[in-house]
Amino acid sequence: MLHHDYNYANDTGDIEPMKITILDDYYDTIRHLPCFEKVAAHDVTIWNDHSQDVDVLAERFKDTEALVLIRERTHIRKALLERLPNLKLISQRSVYPHIDVDDCTRMGIMLCSSQHAGTPSYATVELTWGLILSAMRLIPQQMKSLQAGKWQMAVGKSVRGRTLGIYGYGRIGTAVAELGNAFGMNVQAWGGEGSLDRARADGIDVPASRETFFATSDVISLHVRLYPSTRGIITADDLGGMKPTATLVNTSRAPLIEDGKLVKALNAGRPGFAAVDVYESEPVTDTAYPLLNMPNVICTPHIGYVTEDEYNVQFTDIFDQIVAFNAGNPINVINPDVVKGE
């Protein structure tokens, strides 16, 4: 089934139910979360498939008053917004490069997006380490070999004693670094001045230069939010300066790396390996996608935050924003000019 409708109109008259549409809930997870009760008094439609077709989306959202997005899965651009006369609110979490904020403001549509400044995504931290260990110990390759009727196919590498480079020492980067220390790795960090200051304060090594960071790390894990200023922040020169035995891990956003440069760098042998959870365009359904067919790459389908526990944390924020908006006290407003009526 592509979608489900839930009409829980409140008989008490305490609130005015809103027409809420939730997108891209691939596994029909959200209605089973404890936090779903927060919107139980509203008229909720959940779509389990994905579409980026403007005509399809306009038809689906024609009566929608509050639109719920799961991260950046669906782009909300001017051509779509102009066809949604009933839309009052977009509620989501984290950054919003997939939304035309200025057009939302011009059309009187409020964007509320919690930036979750305090708690890191521990689910993403866990996946990052799953990818690091899988890459170092060649776990997917060993399993594929075993399924083919063969025994051990190669010798892996231990992480203990090797150097872990954290690019972006924020909430997630800090948690990844803590586990690196627990594994007995030598942890170093690079990034903006804020990252470097936090790293130094925590006793994390900061190399003398960016070049040294890339040249000396055995594993580099990226933990930077995607903004216009960080797009392409990892350059071909950075990648080319890595060891041929090194592994690059990206559970952040693919456009942090210069477009097309990762595949070229891997083909050139520096770095020697990569483990990625994010892609330039998602979802990736083309089996000919270059990274999927490289023997020195491990790929997962952007599942860093995809756990029941993380979903409940995220959708608690998202639903709280809807409840607050409906009560006339919006929170986490990205475009406050809508509130001002400008």
Predicted regions and their residues:
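Oxidoreductase and adenylate-handling cofactor-binding alpha/beta cores
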Residues: 125-144, 178-185, 315-329
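Rossmann-like dinucleotide-binding domain for NAD(H)/NADP(H)
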Residues: 111, 244-342
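Rossmann-like adenosine-cofactor binding region
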Residues: 59-62, 75-79, 193-289
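Glycine-rich NAD(P)-binding loop of Rossmann-like domains
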Residues: 142-175, 184, 203-204
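Phosphate-coordination loops involved in phosphoryl transfer and adenosine-cofactor binding
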Residues: 17, 87, 160-163, 236, ...
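Phosphate/diphosphate ligand-binding glycine-rich loop within oxidoreductases
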Residues: 64-143, 157
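N-terminal glycine-/charge-rich "phosphate-binding" loop or analogous flexible N-terminal tail
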Residues: 3-66, 70-71, 184, 326, ...
